[in-house]
UniProtKB/Swiss-Prot annotation:
The keyword Transcription applies. This is DNA-directed RNA polymerase subunit beta. Belongs to the RNA polymerase beta chain family. The gene is rpoB. It holds the Pfam family RNA_pol_Rpb2_6. Its EC number is 2.7.7.6. It comes from Pseudomonas syringae pv. syringae (strain B728a). Keywords: DNA-directed RNA polymerase, Nucleotidyltransferase, Transcription, Transferase. It comes from the Bacteria. It catalyses: RNA(n) + a ribonucleoside 5'-triphosphate = RNA(n+1) + diphosphate. DNA-dependent RNA polymerase catalyzes the transcription of DNA into RNA using the four ribonucleoside triphosphates as substrates. One of its GO terms (biological process) is DNA-templated transcription. GO terms for cellular component: DNA-directed RNA polymerase complex. It is an enzyme of class 2 (transferase).
Length: 1357
């Protein structure tokens, strides 16, 4: 296999047995593809597809005026260019967006002409606000902060059938219901009541009999009965009736008379129940009619109106129950034919017929009025109003839309074959739903499972943005309709009609404050990627935490390969927020799909198909680990498979599909946990969640035991610098990489140079530090998409969230009680867990009523020492070390005139006015913070003079830009002259540039000429002269292009900043804070094994092995068995082997062994102990040496989830590393030198430092803010609150009879206002007495009792 630039420098030993059938797809595709589809940025007018913005415009336009004499049509739209790039937007605190311009056409018709002749057409581009752009990493920059729009998992539109699980009625009877859910519009519910009548609700309002809806649709009673029932036909023959016999319908009935065949043989005796055997005999005998007595039809329901044959008088309406009175009339009138409904109790209930009987309406108008009354109670119904309301509910495209998904799901569910159709409902749709519901009630169908992923779909960014945009457009539409009538008379242009504010506001509201637009988690690359791949069931149109039951949160069989069963938050959101599985993607309808390999008759093919949960249901799917031979045939007699959402076994011939990879079940975060298969699911959940909270350490360290997914995450997260095109590194320093692009990758007209500016010490959303470090050296060759620089938490292009620590599992002096962690001082000395946090502090100078605030170093009443870190503009120097309370930006605010004392008046008279009319409002370093200033940014309003600091910052930025452009020009120019040199050398000159005619051109001749002189050469061949001219034109052109670029950037830098109203100047100071690990910090492994650092011991006191190597961390062995996360033990063993092998390689390098020996040893590691084979023979000797140097600290291993290292392989590795195969060794106590009594498990585990640092949590208070009502101190660090002495603590003091302490706690230390002020004064004076008074909360209690109307007073003795 071919290795990339970084891969061959450090190859991971991979233990996977299964071949890579398919690479893990690009992890951010779900975000980028969705938004790309929404914008359709590069499309021309003809290429626009009917999705996204284009679809939103088409659904609202054309807008036609109320009179119908003017129309506004939509032609197309185009997106402009963003004003600033992403970095500038973050810095300036603005939104990264592009202007949207829409071309619309105003058509005015001639009122006089009868056939709407067009009088006038005006076309114009209208500005419709700004549309935020997605960055290449799938985020949005909104007001300067990076945000992510989380995808939503919601109930798919369509029709769903369900029952109440017997909870509604006390009898426990199942009440069935159907619900038609559109994408937008009113919901329509049908439901049975306990008496088996069908009711309908619109938008969950009052229920009406379902027949009311059918009547409103224009159906008569007879048509309804025809649609739902078959009929029994009786012919009247004197005293008896003759029934047209359908034998199947007699099943289960009791024979009223003997039933005979043609020959008079009795088939069924009178009084016997008719069975399936009897029915077969009847069919054989071919009996078509059956004689029954007249009272056989008593109690049956008529299917058609029964009319007197002579007079035309109605004897019985349809849907009437026949009784003796009606039968007598029938006999008297000599009616020939009676039709009754065929119903029974088993599979054909009389539900619709019963519903019609309780329905009070009798025609369409009454039904419409009834629906109008239900929807608009209290309004007087008119015929037109009722008709309009009903039509708008389900039959108008403006108000109702099933969407393509909804129509597809609807048609499939009611058994239609076509999947396309109208977005609105029709009569047949509603009848079909009712029929299906009645069939289910009759036992001929099953209800739906709403948690099935075939019934839930994912709404991505693009779709949600489109919906919001449409909402804005609908608001615009109303206003435009009003104005269109004026357009006819006043000759307005389209621009005068459209006010884009509502659209811009809707879009801004969605991106700025929607529940699904979230502040991006940016602790480390994994937390970014996971946030973008998150799927939430919450949000607008979704569930709410309180209402979501257990079923919705639970893992469903259809989650397999689509949604991760492990990664979800603990707490109230469990199961409502999920993560996409590693290989999952969405299809055109928004359903999640998972990839499978096609299996044909036991032979596994290379073909891969993506299937949704509905499509996979009928397939028999084998696991990725199913045993195969070399011919790719399944060899087991019975294969473990999934079929119909159940796990079972089948023969290989029945298998139709096979998983592509064992890790397709889990999400990215879970697939980073080695030996996941040995961990309990609850702990794995914690492990995947805690990896997202790891803070990037000072020097990233790759995990010795990984899973092979680390490289994918680092590459796709966008924190590394990836080569856009292949080429040679021209120059590299800490802040930029310049690549001279390979000729075959340069397209005509493009520059053959790529410049990558690295991000240095920038603040992330979580205040951690983003810093990129180059991996390449000058002259290195890189291919496209090679990793050239590491970002935060990445090491040589691999995700590196923590550090490999030497750990021992042993109880040690109680320091690791209850999951505490005992650390060695060496960890602190080597800065293994030192992290850098960057804090942004902002100082704003505003215009106040009394005059403008001023940023200055001239601050009243502040000594010289406090100002020594400020420059003349009053802003702190970059590089200054500052502590709590230091001034960062000097600022003075004018203060109002106060009454002056005589002394102050005297001082003012002597020393002038200035000092007293301003007060000091400088920006100071907050308490508990100490750090280094690493950057200062100054933003000045247009028209306000810029200070020296702002100008110097601007100059340095311009220098950077100029340097980049010069570098680019140098390389382009160099490459052009190289090409010319190779073309000219050895050719003959005609003259020019001081050469004689016929002189041959050599390298020396060219070196003697200045570059400008080359273009004066005249060559004998015309083609060469033409090439010289072209080269000269190209270089002039590039120079001009780069100068334009520079001027553009300069203009941007020099224009004033767009600041909020009333703000004159903003100064942002960035502090870098170094945090070493200390007791109280939270640490964790990757298996959910978390703990708090309890103590940091000197190295010499730590347990050490026989060689004297001390361990770094001591963990409690009791934390393992009960939690069942054995993965950590296996990781520790394999980590020990990895480290041991690294030490062996290190010794070989130090002893300067031959490369062949190194090769042999590396071959043993990579190719002789299980797992994937590595092609080391492809590497040159130098590359082998490079590889060995990078393996000195340990050979990194990959043990992919569900396909990792076996116990035997771990033992073989330990043996190869000359380590004990048990993974245990004898340790000695560092303090006494004594052996511990038994061997201890020692090895290397990957430990993370989590973003729960004691520095951020701990604070102290003496006095501070108090609650307004109770006068008790507030709680929490943010409010600078105190410790709550709660109910239980009071009990404790009561138990000890500590009356005075209790009194102090409840009065002066809490809410006795006078007492505490007095106490404070006393302490200041050195007097420690206290005088407790009345606690304020007691007064509150008295007031509350009075509010109940009880007068209460405290009587003093």
């Amino acid at each position: 296999m071919a290795y990339s630039y970084t891969e061959k420098k450090r190859i991971r030993k991979d233990f996977s047995k299964l071949p890579d059938v398919m690479d893990v797809p690009y992890l951010l595709a779900i975000q980028l593809d969705s938004y790309r589809e929404f914008l359709q940025a590069g499309a021309t007018k003809d290429q626009f597809r009917d999705v996204g913005l284009h679809a939103a415009f088409k659904s609202v336009f054309p807008i036609i005026s109320y009179s119908g004499n003017a129309a506004l049509e939509y032609v197309g739209y185009r997106l402009g260019e963003p004003a600033f790039d992403v970095k500038e937007c973050v810095l300036r605190g603005v939104t990264y967006a592009v202007p949207l311009r829409v071309k619309v056409r105003l058509i005015i018709f001639d009122k006089e002409s009868s056939n709407k002749a067009i009088k006038d057409i005006k076309e114009q581009e209208v500005y419709m606000g700004e549309i935020p752009l997605m960055t290449e990493n799938g985020t949005f920059v909104i007001n300067g902060t990076e945000r992510v729009i989380v995808s939503q998992l919601h109930r798919s539109p369509g029709v769903f059938f369900d029952h109440d699980r017997g909870k509604t009625h006390s009898s426990g009877k199942l009440l069935y219901s159907a619900r038609i859910i559109p994408y937008r519009g009113s919901w329509l519910d049908f439901e049975f009541d306990p008496k088996d009548c069908v009711f309908v609700r619109i938008d969950r309002r009052r229920k009406l009999p379902a027949s009311v809806l059918l009547r409103a649709l224009g159906y008569t009673t007879e048509q309804v009965l025809d649609a739902f029932y078959t009929t029994n036909v009786f012919h009247v023959r004197g005293e008896n009736l003759s029934l047209e016999l359908v034998p199947q319908r007699l099943r289960g009935e009791i024979a009223v008379l003997d039933i005979l065949d043609d020959k008079g043989k009795v088939i069924v005796e009178q009084g016997r129940r008719i069975t399936a055997r009897h029915i077969n005999q009847l069919e054989k005998a071919g009996i078509k009619e059956l004689e029954v007595p007249l009272d056989y039809v008593l109690g049956r329901t008529t299917a058609k109106v029964i009319v007197h044959p002579a007079t035309g008088e109605i004897i019985a309406e349809c849907n009437t129950e026949l009784n003796t009175e009606i039968l007598a009339k029938i006999a008297k009138a000599q009616v020939v034919r009676i039709e009754t409904l065929y119903t029974n109790d088993i599979d054909c209930g009389p539900f619709v017929s019963d519903t019609l009987k309780i329905d009070s309406t009798s025609n369409q108008l009454e039904a419409l009025v009834e629906i109008y009354r239900m929807m608009r109670p209290g309004e007087p119904p008119t015929k037109d109003a009722a008709e309009t309301l009903f039509n708008n509910l389900f039959f108008s495209p403006e108000r109702y839309d099933l969407s393509a998904v909804g129509r597809m799901k609807f048609n499939r569910r009611i058994g239609r074959t076509e999947i396309e159709g109208s977005g609105v409902l029709c009569k047949e749709d509603i009848v079909a739903v009712l029929k299906t519901l009645v069939d289910i009630r009759n036992g001929k169908g099953i209800v739906d499972d709403i948690d099935h992923l075939g019934n839930r779909r994912v709404r991505c960014v693009g779709e949600m943005a489109e919906n919001q945009f449409r909402v804005g457009l609908v608001r615009v539409e109303r206003a435009v309709k009003e104005r269109l009538s004026m357009a006819e008379s006043e000759g307005l242009m389209p621009q005068d009609l459209i006010n884009a504010k509502p659209v811009a506001a809707a879009v801004k509201e969605f991106f700025g404050s929607s529940q699904l637009s979230q502040f991006m988690g940016q602790n480390n690359p994994l937390s970014e990627i996971t946030h973008k791949r998150r799927v939430s069931a919450l949000g607008p149109g979704g569930l709410t935490r309180e209402r979501a039951g257990f079923e919705v949160r639970d893992v469903h069989p259809t989650h397999y390969g689509r949604v991760c069963p492990i990664e979800t938050p603990e707490g109230p959101n469990i199961g409502l927020i999920n993560s996409l599985a590693a290989y999952a993607r969405t299809n055109q309808y928004g359903f999640l799909e998972s990839p499978y390999r096609v299996v044909k008759e036991g032979l596994v093919t290379e073909e891969i198909v993506f299937l949704s949960a509905i499509e996979e249901a009928d397939h028999v799917i084998a696991q990725a680990s199913a045993a195969m031979n070399d011919k790719q045939e399944l060899i087991d007699e019975l294969v473990a498979v999934r079929h119909l959402n159940e796990f079972t076994v089948k023969a290989p011939a029945d298998v139709t599909l096979m998983d592509v990879s064992p890790k397709q079940v889990v999400s990215v975060a879970a697939s980073l946990i080695p030996f996941l298969e040995h961990d309990d699911a609850n702990r794995a959940l914690m492990g995947s969640n805690m990896q997202r909270q790891a803070v990037p350490t000072l020097r990233a360290d790759k995990p010795l035991v990984g899973t092979g997914m680390e490289r994918n995450v680092a590459r796709d997260s966008g924190v590394c610098v990836v080569a856009r095109r292949g080429g040679v590194i021209d120059s590299v320093d800490a802040s930029r990489i310049v690549v001279r692009v390979a000729d075959d990758e340069v397209e005509t007209g493009e520059a053959g140079v790529d410049i990558y500016n690295l991000t240095k010490y920038t603040r992330s959303n979580q205040n951690t530090c983003i810093n990129q470090r180059p991996l390449v050296s000058k002259g290195d060759r890189v291919q496209r998409s090679d990793i050239m620089a590491d970002g935060p938490s990445t090491d040589m292009g691999e995700l590196a969230l923590g550090q490999n620590m030497r750990i021992a599992f042993m109880a040690w002096n109680g320091f690791n009680f209850e999951d505490s962690i005992c650390l060695s001082e060496r960890v602190v000395q080597e800065d293994r867990f030192t992290t850098i946090h960057i804090q942004e502090l902002t100082c704003v100078a505003r215009d106040t009523k009394l005059g403008p605030e001023e940023i200055t170093a001239d601050i009243p009443n502040v000594g010289e020492a406090a100002l020594n870190k400020l420059d003349e503009a009053g802003i702190v120097y970059v590089g200054a070390e500052v502590g709590a309370g230091d001034i960062l930006v000097g600022k003075v605010t004018p203060k109002g005139e106060t009454q002056l004392t005589p002394e102050e008046k005297l001082l003012r008279a002597i020393f002038g006015e200035k000092a007293s009319d301003v007060k000091d409002t400088s920006l100071r370093v907050p308490t508990g913070t100490k750090g280094t200033v690493i950057d200062v940014q100054v933003f000045t309003r247009d028209g306000v003079e810029r200070d020296a600091r702002a100008l110097s910052i601007e100059k340095s930025q311009l220098d950077e830009i100029r340097k980049d452009l010069n570098e680019e020009f140098r390389i382009v120019e160099g490459a052009t002259f190289e090409r010319l040199r190779s073309a000219l050398v050895g050719r003959v000159a005609e003259g020019g540039a001081g050469l004689k005619k016929g002189q041959e051109i050599t390298n020396e001749v060219l070196d003697g000429l200045e570059h400008g002189q080359w273009f004066k050469l005249r060559m004998a061949e015309d083609a060469l002269n033409e090439q010289l001219e072209k080269a000269q034109a190209y270089i002039v052109d590039r120079r001009r292009l780069l100068d334009d670029k520079f001027e553009d950037k300069k203009r941007k830098l020099q224009q004033g900043d767009d600041l909020a109203p009333g703000v004159l100047k903003i100064v942002k100071v960035y502090l870098a804070i170094r945090r070493r690990i200390q007791p109280g910090d939270k640490m964790a492994g990757r298996h959910g094994n978390k703990g708090v650092v309890s103590v940091i011991m000197p190295v010499e006191d730590m347990p050490h092995d026989a060689n004297g190597t001390p361990v770094d961390i001591v963990l409690n062995p009791l934390g393992v068995p009960s939690r069942m996360n054995v993965g950590q033990i296996l990781e520790t063993h394999l980590g020990l082997a990895a480290k041991g092998l690294g030490e062996k390689i290190n010794r070989m390098l130090e002893e300067q062994r031959k490369v062949a020996e190194l090769r042999k040893f590396l071959n043993e590691i990579y190719n002789e102990i299980g797992g994937r084979q590595e092609s080391l023979e492809d590497l040159t000797d130098n590359e082998i040496l490079d590889l060995a140097k990078n393996l000195r600290n340990g050979v990194p291993m990959a043990t992919p989830v569900f396909d990792g290292a076996k116990e035997s392989e771990i033992k073989a590795m330990l043996k190869l590393a000359d380590m004990p195969e048990s993974g245990q060794m004898q340790l000695f106590d560092g303090r006494t030198g004594n052996k511990f009594e038994r061997a201890v498990t020692v090895g290397y585990m990957y430990m993370l430092k989590l973003n729960h640092l004691v520095d951020d949590k701990m604070h102290a208070r003496s006095t501070g803010s108090y609650s307004l009502v109770t006068q008790q101190p507030l709680g929490g660090k943010a409010q600078f609150g105190g410790q709550r002495f709660g109910e239980m603590e009071v009990w404790a003091l009561e138990a000890y009879c500590a009356a005075y302490t209790l009194q102090e706690m409840l009065t002066v230390k809490s809410d006795d206002v006078n007492g505490r002020t007095k106490m404070y004064k006393n302490i200041v004076d050195g007097d420690h007495r206290m005088e407790p008074g009345m606690p304020e909360s007691f007064n509150v209690l008295i007031k509350e009792i009075r509010s109940l109307g009880i007068d209460i007073d405290l009587e003093t003795e």
